[in-house]
Amino acid sequence: MKKIAIIGAGISGLFIANLFKKDPNYQITIYEKNISLALDQGYGVQLSVNSIRILNKIGFRKFENNEKFTPEKINFYSNENSNKICDLDITEFNSEDCKYTTLKRSSLINFLKTDLEGMIKTGYNI
């Protein structure tokens, strides 16, 4: 069995741990410097269609629909005078199972850590 140490329990570290976890030949440990995972409610993230495609490899399809939003367009505004510049129809980039998505960072972290119990070691400095 190969041992893998992942430094950081952020979105990327938790995602790659989920990928490695699929292979029983790997023993994974995630080292996080903070004493707990940052689950502040206020931060939002936007996930492109390509991001959703790779998240689907670890079961993102089963993520609760009431915790995510799939907008149909993005509006762009001038920073100088707040006038709308244009909008972008993002549904053109979507497929049936991969849609541009927004959600709380804390919701994504909770999803990513669900199957990693016992693998995350907090309070470690490298």
Q: Could you say what each language-model-derived stretch is?
A:
Residues 1-12:
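Beta1/beta-strand and adjacent pyrophosphate-binding region of the FAD-binding site
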Residues 4, 48-126:
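Conserved N-terminal helical subregion
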Residues 7, 31-33, 122:
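A secondary-structure boundary/capping signal
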Residues 11-12, 35-36, 52:
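Short, solvent-exposed loop/turn segments at secondary-structure junctions
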Residues 19-41:
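Glycine-rich FAD pyrophosphate-binding loop
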Residues 43-47:
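Active-site loop of classical SDR/Rossmann-like NAD(P)-dependent oxidoreductases
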